[in-house]
Design a protein with these regions (language model features):
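Beta-strand-rich structural segments
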Residues: 31-44, 137-149
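A short, solvent-exposed beta-strand micro-motif common in secreted/extracellular proteins
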Residues: 90-97, 188-196
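Mid-chain, structured segments of secreted extracytoplasmic proteins
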Residues: 63-110
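Short amphipathic beta-strand segments in non-cytosolic proteins
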Residues: 58-68, 157-171
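Bacterial N-terminal signal peptides that target proteins for export
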Residues: 1-6
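Beta-strand-rich domain onsets/edges
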Residues: 21-32, 106-143, 201-242
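N-terminal signal peptide c-region/cleavage motif recognized by signal peptidases
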Residues: 14-17
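Glycine-centered loop-to-beta-strand initiation motif
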Residues: 76-82, 173-187
Protein backbone atom coordinates (compact mmCIF):
# COMPACT_ATOMS: atom_id res chain seq x y z
CA UNK A 1 0.00 0.00 0.00
CA UNK A 2 1.44 3.34 -0.99
CA UNK A 3 1.85 5.89 1.76
CA UNK A 4 1.44 9.53 0.87
CA UNK A 5 0.83 12.81 2.56
CA UNK A 6 -0.75 16.05 1.46
CA UNK A 7 -0.12 19.59 2.63
CA UNK A 8 -1.16 22.97 1.33
CA UNK A 9 2.20 23.90 -0.26
CA UNK A 10 1.87 27.66 -0.45
CA UNK A 11 0.69 27.94 3.12
CA UNK A 12 3.28 25.47 4.36
CA UNK A 13 6.18 27.30 2.74
CA UNK A 14 5.09 30.71 3.95
CA UNK A 15 3.51 30.13 7.33
CA UNK A 16 4.77 26.78 8.58
CA UNK A 17 2.86 23.78 9.82
CA UNK A 18 -0.09 25.49 11.52
CA UNK A 19 -1.81 26.74 8.36
CA UNK A 20 -1.09 23.55 6.40
CA UNK A 21 -3.10 21.42 8.80
CA UNK A 22 -6.70 20.29 8.98
CA UNK A 23 -9.14 19.65 11.76
CA UNK A 24 -11.15 16.44 11.88
CA UNK A 25 -13.62 14.78 14.22
CA UNK A 26 -13.16 11.37 15.80
CA UNK A 27 -14.20 9.43 18.86
CA UNK A 28 -11.85 9.73 21.82
CA UNK A 29 -10.70 6.90 24.08
CA UNK A 30 -13.17 8.25 26.66
CA UNK A 31 -16.04 7.66 24.24
CA UNK A 32 -17.00 11.24 23.37
CA UNK A 33 -16.24 13.14 20.18
CA UNK A 34 -13.07 15.22 19.93
CA UNK A 35 -11.83 17.85 17.48
CA UNK A 36 -8.28 17.06 16.35
CA UNK A 37 -5.81 19.46 14.73
CA UNK A 38 -2.95 18.15 12.62
CA UNK A 39 -2.61 15.68 9.73
CA UNK A 40 -4.72 12.53 9.94
CA UNK A 41 -2.72 10.63 7.30
CA UNK A 42 0.54 11.40 9.09
CA UNK A 43 -0.86 10.31 12.46
CA UNK A 44 -0.09 13.82 13.69
CA UNK A 45 -2.24 15.33 16.41
CA UNK A 46 -1.06 18.70 17.62
CA UNK A 47 -0.89 19.22 21.36
CA UNK A 48 -1.07 21.78 24.14
CA UNK A 49 1.28 23.37 24.95
CA UNK A 50 2.04 23.79 21.25
CA UNK A 51 0.17 24.54 18.03
CA UNK A 52 -3.15 23.44 19.52
CA UNK A 53 -3.04 26.67 21.51
CA UNK A 54 -3.50 28.64 18.25
CA UNK A 55 -7.21 27.91 18.46
CA UNK A 56 -9.68 30.01 20.37
CA UNK A 57 -12.62 27.73 21.08
CA UNK A 58 -13.90 25.52 18.25
CA UNK A 59 -17.70 25.34 18.21
CA UNK A 60 -19.54 22.12 17.39
CA UNK A 61 -23.10 20.99 16.77
CA UNK A 62 -24.62 17.53 17.09
CA UNK A 63 -27.14 17.18 14.25
CA UNK A 64 -29.96 14.80 15.12
CA UNK A 65 -33.58 14.11 14.22
CA UNK A 66 -34.32 15.07 17.83
CA UNK A 67 -32.89 18.54 17.24
CA UNK A 68 -29.49 20.20 17.15
CA UNK A 69 -27.25 20.50 20.23
CA UNK A 70 -24.35 22.97 20.21
CA UNK A 71 -21.31 23.25 22.47
CA UNK A 72 -17.81 24.70 22.56
CA UNK A 73 -14.88 22.32 22.59
CA UNK A 74 -12.97 21.95 25.86
CA UNK A 75 -9.21 22.03 25.30
CA UNK A 76 -7.28 18.98 26.41
CA UNK A 77 -3.69 17.90 25.80
CA UNK A 78 -4.35 16.58 22.27
CA UNK A 79 -7.62 18.08 21.08
CA UNK A 80 -10.90 19.73 21.99
CA UNK A 81 -13.33 17.41 23.77
CA UNK A 82 -17.06 17.64 23.06
CA UNK A 83 -19.86 16.71 25.49
CA UNK A 84 -21.57 14.44 22.95
CA UNK A 85 -20.90 11.88 20.24
CA UNK A 86 -22.77 10.93 17.08
CA UNK A 87 -25.06 7.91 17.35
CA UNK A 88 -26.38 6.02 14.32
CA UNK A 89 -28.12 8.42 11.95
CA UNK A 90 -26.57 11.50 13.57
CA UNK A 91 -23.65 13.71 12.58
CA UNK A 92 -21.43 16.37 14.14
CA UNK A 93 -20.11 19.55 12.54
CA UNK A 94 -17.39 21.79 13.98
CA UNK A 95 -15.46 24.90 12.98
CA UNK A 96 -13.09 27.54 14.31
CA UNK A 97 -14.28 30.86 12.91
CA UNK A 98 -11.75 32.85 14.93
CA UNK A 99 -8.42 31.32 14.00
CA UNK A 100 -5.92 34.23 14.20
CA UNK A 101 -5.42 36.25 11.04
CA UNK A 102 -1.89 36.23 9.65
CA UNK A 103 0.07 38.32 7.13
CA UNK A 104 2.55 37.29 4.47
CA UNK A 105 4.48 39.05 1.74
CA UNK A 106 7.31 41.55 1.50
CA UNK A 107 7.47 45.23 2.35
CA UNK A 108 4.27 47.06 1.49
CA UNK A 109 2.89 44.05 -0.38
CA UNK A 110 1.32 42.31 2.61
CA UNK A 111 -1.63 39.95 2.28
CA UNK A 112 -3.85 39.45 5.30
CA UNK A 113 -5.24 35.91 5.39
CA UNK A 114 -7.82 33.98 7.36
CA UNK A 115 -7.50 30.21 7.83
CA UNK A 116 -11.01 28.80 8.37
CA UNK A 117 -10.97 25.11 9.37
CA UNK A 118 -14.13 23.02 9.62
CA UNK A 119 -15.09 19.37 10.00
CA UNK A 120 -18.00 16.96 9.81
CA UNK A 121 -18.40 13.43 11.18
CA UNK A 122 -21.02 11.06 9.78
CA UNK A 123 -22.25 7.65 10.90
CA UNK A 124 -23.78 6.62 7.55
CA UNK A 125 -24.34 8.02 4.06
CA UNK A 126 -27.88 9.31 4.60
CA UNK A 127 -28.34 12.60 2.74
CA UNK A 128 -27.72 15.68 4.87
CA UNK A 129 -28.13 19.43 4.55
CA UNK A 130 -25.24 21.92 4.61
CA UNK A 131 -24.27 23.36 7.98
CA UNK A 132 -20.78 24.73 7.27
CA UNK A 133 -19.63 27.45 4.88
CA UNK A 134 -17.53 24.84 3.05
CA UNK A 135 -19.14 21.48 3.68
CA UNK A 136 -18.62 17.89 2.51
CA UNK A 137 -21.94 16.05 2.69
CA UNK A 138 -23.16 12.50 2.15
CA UNK A 139 -25.73 12.37 -0.64
CA UNK A 140 -27.62 9.21 0.27
CA UNK A 141 -25.50 6.99 -1.99
CA UNK A 142 -22.69 5.00 -0.29
CA UNK A 143 -19.29 6.49 -1.12
CA UNK A 144 -20.73 9.61 -2.76
CA UNK A 145 -20.08 13.07 -1.31
CA UNK A 146 -21.13 16.55 -2.34
CA UNK A 147 -18.97 19.62 -1.77
CA UNK A 148 -20.99 22.74 -1.01
CA UNK A 149 -19.79 26.33 -0.59
CA UNK A 150 -22.18 28.90 0.88
CA UNK A 151 -25.05 26.50 0.26
CA UNK A 152 -24.25 25.88 -3.43
CA UNK A 153 -22.48 22.93 -5.10
CA UNK A 154 -18.78 23.59 -5.74
CA UNK A 155 -17.69 22.01 -9.04
CA UNK A 156 -14.23 21.10 -10.35
CA UNK A 157 -12.62 21.03 -6.92
CA UNK A 158 -10.16 18.43 -5.64
CA UNK A 159 -11.23 16.16 -2.80
CA UNK A 160 -8.71 13.88 -1.08
CA UNK A 161 -9.67 10.71 0.78
CA UNK A 162 -7.15 9.41 3.35
CA UNK A 163 -7.00 6.32 5.58
CA UNK A 164 -5.06 5.81 8.80
CA UNK A 165 -2.03 4.25 7.07
CA UNK A 166 -1.50 7.43 5.06
CA UNK A 167 -2.78 5.99 1.76
CA UNK A 168 -4.83 8.54 -0.12
CA UNK A 169 -6.80 8.98 -3.31
CA UNK A 170 -7.83 12.19 -5.04
CA UNK A 171 -10.81 12.97 -7.27
CA UNK A 172 -12.45 16.09 -8.67
CA UNK A 173 -16.04 17.13 -8.09
CA UNK A 174 -18.38 17.20 -11.07
CA UNK A 175 -20.69 20.06 -12.08
CA UNK A 176 -23.02 19.23 -9.18
CA UNK A 177 -20.13 19.23 -6.71
CA UNK A 178 -20.32 15.44 -6.37
CA UNK A 179 -17.51 12.93 -6.09
CA UNK A 180 -17.47 9.18 -5.46
CA UNK A 181 -14.87 7.04 -3.71
CA UNK A 182 -14.54 3.30 -3.24
CA UNK A 183 -13.97 2.40 0.41
CA UNK A 184 -12.72 -1.20 0.48
CA UNK A 185 -11.20 -1.20 3.98
CA UNK A 186 -12.89 -1.09 7.33
CA UNK A 187 -11.87 1.71 9.67
CA UNK A 188 -11.59 5.48 9.51
CA UNK A 189 -11.69 7.54 6.32
CA UNK A 190 -11.11 11.30 6.27
CA UNK A 191 -12.04 13.29 3.15
CA UNK A 192 -10.70 16.82 2.74
CA UNK A 193 -11.38 19.75 0.42
CA UNK A 194 -10.33 23.39 0.37
CA UNK A 195 -11.47 26.60 -1.24
CA UNK A 196 -9.95 30.07 -1.45
CA UNK A 197 -12.12 33.20 -1.39
CA UNK A 198 -10.28 36.39 -2.39
CA UNK A 199 -13.24 38.74 -1.94
CA UNK A 200 -11.78 40.23 1.23
CA UNK A 201 -13.64 41.84 4.08
CA UNK A 202 -13.56 42.47 7.80
CA UNK A 203 -14.46 40.38 10.82
CA UNK A 204 -15.01 41.50 14.40
CA UNK A 205 -11.92 40.65 16.44
CA UNK A 206 -11.26 41.59 20.09
CA UNK A 207 -8.15 43.55 19.08
CA UNK A 208 -9.95 45.34 16.25
CA UNK A 209 -7.55 44.04 13.59
CA UNK A 210 -10.19 42.22 11.61
CA UNK A 211 -9.53 43.17 7.98
CA UNK A 212 -8.50 40.36 5.64
CA UNK A 213 -7.78 39.85 1.94
CA UNK A 214 -8.24 36.09 1.60
CA UNK A 215 -10.20 33.38 3.38
CA UNK A 216 -8.73 29.90 3.03
CA UNK A 217 -11.39 27.31 3.88
CA UNK A 218 -10.36 23.74 4.69
CA UNK A 219 -13.06 21.21 5.52
CA UNK A 220 -13.04 17.48 6.31
CA UNK A 221 -15.50 14.63 6.61
CA UNK A 222 -14.86 11.60 8.83
CA UNK A 223 -16.54 8.24 8.36
CA UNK A 224 -15.76 5.00 10.21
CA UNK A 225 -16.65 2.03 7.99
CA UNK A 226 -17.70 -0.94 10.14
CA UNK A 227 -16.88 -3.65 7.60
CA UNK A 228 -14.47 -4.40 4.78
CA UNK A 229 -10.88 -5.52 4.28
CA UNK A 230 -8.65 -5.36 7.34
CA UNK A 231 -6.85 -2.00 7.15
CA UNK A 232 -3.11 -1.41 7.38
CA UNK A 233 -2.38 0.11 10.81
CA UNK A 234 -1.38 3.73 11.25
CA UNK A 235 2.32 4.44 11.45
CA UNK A 236 4.05 5.69 14.60
CA UNK A 237 2.52 8.86 16.01
CA UNK A 238 4.25 11.97 14.66
CA UNK A 239 5.73 14.41 17.17
CA UNK A 240 3.58 17.52 17.70
CA UNK A 241 5.02 20.87 16.66
CA UNK A 242 6.03 23.37 19.30
Amino acid sequence: MKKNWMLVPALLCTFGAAQAHQIWLEESSQGGAVVRFGEFGENLREASPGLLDKFGKPAATLVSAKGDTSADGKKQADGFALPFKAQKGESIVAEDARYPLYSWGEGDKQTRSWFYPAARQITDFSAQKPKLTLDLLPTGTPGELQLVYQGKPLPKTKVTLTVQSGWMKQAQTDEQGRVTFEMPWSGTYVAEASHEDRTGGERKDPDGAGKYDIVYYVTTLTYVKPDGIEPVPAGPAASPNK
